[in-house]
Amino acid sequence: MELTSEEYEELRGLLGTPDIGNADTLKKAFLKACKVHHPDKGGNEEAMKRLLYLYNKAKIAASATTSQVPEYGTSQWEQWWEEFNQGFDEQDLHCDEELEPSDNEEENPAGSQAPGSQATPPKKPRTSPDFPEVLKEYVSNALFTNRTYNCFIIFTTAEKGKELYPCIQAAYKCTFIALYMYNGDSVLYIITVGKHRVNAMENLCSKKCTVSFLQAKGVLKPQEAYNVCCTFELISQNIQGGLPSSFFNPVQEEEKSVNWKLISEFACSIKCTDPLLLMALYLEFTTAPEACKVCDNPRRLEHRRHHTKDHTLNALLFQDSKTQKTICNQACDTVLAKRRLDMKTLTRNELLVQRWQGLFQEMEDLFGARGEEHLAHRMAAVMWLNALHPNMPDVIFNYIKMVVENKPKQRYLLLKGPVNCGKTTVAAGLIGLCGGAYLNINCPPERLAFELGMAIDQFTVVFEDVKGKKSSKSSLQTGIGFENLDNLRDHLDGAVPVNLERKHQNKVTQIFPPGIVTCNEYDIPLTVKIRMYQKVELLHNYNLYKSLKNTEEVGKKRYLQSGITWLLLLIYFRSVDDFTEKLQECVVKWKERIETEVGDMWLLTMKENIEQGKNILEK
């Protein structure tokens, strides 16, 4: 069933194509026309029906005229092959034809020629002169390279050299270009503004040198090559008088950079391990010392002590540096490295002396001519701490002796007592006095390894507010603190080194530091209790609480938790002989200042005020 001529024209119009073509073309045109005529696409329903009818009719007609070849090797293919070749052998393909002879031609041997003529002699191969020998050691001889240069030498004929001179100068806007004659040929010495490949220069010149020889080289040693070219005959150059020697060796001012060592020394002197804090502190040095307002601040005497011209000049460079954080990170790493070296090489007594020397320097700043604090306020805090325990000076002295000697299984002080009895205050003061870190032992076991990593290179540690599972007070929350401590027997004993780790750092093997364990009234496991060398129980005293509340000068400024306050407690209550020889001079000096500025009578009055819950400073 074939399409009539009218139906054929109608189908062409609906498909919008000049010719239907084969089945594949018909199908593509039909799918495209469906998007136009389909009612869902906004087309005419009648036109779509008519298109579908005519398409199906045309597809049947096309398939009827298309023969399909059966699969090779099957019986159907054998039958098709016989039908296809039927009658082929009977056809006579012979053609009776006689060729007329061509004009009489004499067979001439190859290369024969008419008498009297002469063959054109073959052209001799053109030879290009070698590149000037005197320049070879200063140019690159690489055949294929992507390296870029800003200095080139072109070697070509005398005529092409004159032609290339203005062409190159216009194309590359050369800083310098000169044309020389060398043994009858041209040498072009070129310095461009930017860098280019040798083949780019060669491609430009080859457009002018289709027949003439051309050699382009990148120059490795521009000054030496120019000096050799100056021995040739000069034809032209774009700079009158040529290039001065200073062109190749310009006098450059030495670029000043940030002195990293100076920043590291500053970080070590203030023992800063926080990169962001160090960055802020060092940027304060950008102002000249004589105009610095920070130096006039009585609370910033450490800044005044370090603010010198060297730091000011370096801080100005540091201010414009793009690597501020990197510099500060390295400086803080230097502080940590020095601390680790001290922990490995110094005795614990020497480490404590260093710590206390820093505290004495801080006391000079606080109570000196520029300081804002009053020694009497600190001594009020000392008398309050002394009232916490009947033998507080002896407790502190024995604790310091214990952490300095650091004997195995004789390394920890247990502070136990009810809520709000002063355990945390004592622990914080001793950390300020000796240096150390706080550890949260109540965390889950999987986090415990990184928590213990805080003890790396520390003098002492505090296991703060350790929780247990049983207690005499039902109101206390239970926890796994003592269970975790029980699993850290090697850490508490201090007999063998243990592995400590922090995130993004390698493990460190060291003896775990001694320290303090504070807890409320929990039942302590026996295996933990026997590892507590000193045990101190504190009691809640309402008058202590009341006197502290009435004396804002002491509680508001956190004097009770300051290492300086605890050092003053030892200075006042212990004899000079209890201190090492390096510190005895400072101890004598501060004993005299306490006697002069406060006096025993006022201190006795402070003690009575504390016992009565009054303002400690009231006379």
From Swiss-Prot:
Enzyme class: isomerase
Chain segments carrying region Disordered: 98-131
Binding-site list for Zn(2+): C292, C295, H303, H307
InterPro entries reported in the protein's UniProt record: DnaJ_domain, Helicase_SF3_DNA-vir, J_dom_sf, Lg_T_Ag_polyomavir, Lg_T_Ag_Polyomavir_C, P-loop_NTPase, T_Ag_DNA-bd, Znf_lg_T-Ag_D1-typ
Limits of the SF3 helicase domain: 391-586
Subcellular location: Host nucleus
Modified residues (Phosphoserine): S102
Cofactor: binding comment: DNA helicase activity requires Mg(2+).
Cofactor dependency: Mg(2+)
Quaternary context: Forms homohexamers in the presence of ATP. Interacts with host HDAC1. Interacts (via LXCXE domain) with host RB1; the interaction induces the aberrant dissociation of RB1-E2F1 complex thereby disrupting RB1's activity. Interacts (via LXCXE domain) with host pRB-related proteins RBL1 and RBL2. Interacts (via C-terminus) with host TOP1 and POLA1 allowing DNA replication. Interacts with host TP53, inhibiting TP53 binding to DNA. Interacts with host preinitiation complex components TBP, TFIIA and TFIID to regulate transcription initiation.
Name the record gives this protein: Large T antigen
Organism: Bovine polyomavirus
Organism ancestry: Viruses, Monodnaviria, Shotokuvirae, Cossaviricota, Papovaviricetes
